Amino acid sequence: MKLLVIGNGGREHALAWKLAQSPKVETVFVAPGNAGTAIEPKLQNIDLTAHQDLIEFCRKENIVFTVVGPEAPLAAGIVDDFRAAGLKIFGPTQYAAQLESSKDFAKAFMAKYNIPTAQYQTFENADAAHDYVNQKGAPIVIKADGLAAGKGVIVAMTLDEAHAAIDDMLLDNKMGNAGARVVIEDFLQGEEASFIVMVDGNNVLPMATSQDHKRLLDGDKGLNTGGMGAYSPAPVVTPVVYERAMNEIILPTVAGMKAEGHEFTGFLYAGLMIDQSGAPYTIEFNCRFGDPETQPIMSRLNSDLSDLVEAAIDGKLDSVTAEWSPQTAVGVVLAAQNYPETPKKGDIISGLDAANQIGKVFHAGTTANEKGDVLTNGGRVLCVVGLGDNVAQAKAKAYGALEKISFDGMQYRKDIADKAINR
């Protein structure tokens, strides 16, 4: 069968790569894809992004189903458009995707359904926001209401930082429409984890646990990014935390969306903060697989992903199970110079073949020129995954592979997965 994956990042490379491993799959088209999906066996890039063009392509090629990678097409209603055209697609509707595309919608939803999260208020007026911050004190968290590519969250450790973030979003319009409203919430302490599940509207199939590294620099310093590395499984998600996250967060969310008259289908990602007592709180929802978490998680999935997605689209997730490798996977992101602000593009990347002999290199911000050179073409350029019998082995494999790669201005963290090693 022929499938379609929408997106051009490392997450989409990993999803398409995993789907293509199924003996039932002939070709996975990736729209628009990158330099990695262009050369991966059984994958083929197509240069289409408009919903109607993609719908016509699916009809012409008899695509069995489509998987949506990134958040922007979901927020733009691609699932609604495909379903209206009678095509099978895995992802949430535009309404359900508001769990990610509007922080205010998500927080109000959590309040209504008693899903544990930080206390918050929403503001459009800068003066009122400044007053609230002065009253609450720091540390405090300022979030753009809309989609900001994972960079719309400022964890302000001082009041000055909080006031500056409010001014950037509400007065200086630095986030555009995404920051025209801000959610200000209490700072939660603990350890973060990514809890990702597949949902068919009623049934839930958990994916492997993982932990992301959001900050640019070692020791969780520097600017927030889309994610600089991840590992799976995440030891902080103990069996007790796992049960609590399912029962207190995931299942009430799925039931709540159904009660609202908008069943949630697709990947649901709860960003968790786990406090010292083991209580999980929801920091954010994403309505798609995480990036870079997808890369290590897919590296551990032994099941046929196409079977799982088909079951989910057909409302039969309760009839399948996901089998995971007992190994640990560590993924390290290689980012361009000046990421996350003004990443440099167009530099030649060398050493990819040598790195792929040691680990698995997933492409994100890459493109190829006429000569076949792979060039940097985005902020996060590559994610290198290593597998091992324990976290230390997997980390060594990932960094061993990564050391073969070079491009001008390449930056990466050297401490990915250390939290798990040091536990």
From Swiss-Prot:
Keyword annotations: ATP-binding, Ligase, Magnesium, Manganese, Metal-binding, Nucleotide-binding, Purine biosynthesis
Catalysed transformations (reactions): 5-phospho-beta-D-ribosylamine + glycine + ATP = N(1)-(5-phospho-beta-D-ribosyl)glycinamide + ADP + phosphate + H(+)
Listed GO biological process terms: 'de novo' IMP biosynthetic process; purine nucleobase biosynthetic process
Xref: Pfam families: GARS_A, GARS_C, GARS_N
Binding annotation for Mg(2+): 284, 286
Statement: the UniProt record of this protein carries the keyword Metal-binding: yes
SUPFAM superfamilies xref list: Glutathione synthetase ATP-binding domain-like (SSF56059), PreATP-grasp domain (SSF52440), Rudiment single hybrid motif (SSF51246)
The record's free-text note on cofactor binding: Binds 1 Mg(2+) or Mn(2+) ion per subunit.
Binding positions for ATP per the UniProt entry: 133-194
Residue stretches making up the ATP-grasp domain: 107-314
Cofactor(s) the protein requires to work: Mg(2+); Mn(2+)
Any one Gene Ontology molecular-function term assigned to this protein's record: phosphoribosylamine-glycine ligase activity
EC number assigned by the record: 6.3.4.13
Biological or metabolic pathway of the protein: Purine metabolism; IMP biosynthesis via de novo pathway; N(1)-(5-phospho-D-ribosyl)glycinamide from 5-phospho-alpha-D-ribose 1-diphosphate: step 2/2
UniProt key word Translocase: no
Entry-linked NCBIfam families: purD
Protein family according to the UniProt entry: Belongs to the GARS family.
Descriptive protein name: Phosphoribosylamine--glycine ligase
Organism of origin: Neisseria meningitidis serogroup B (strain ATCC BAA-335 / MC58)
Gene that specifies this protein: purD
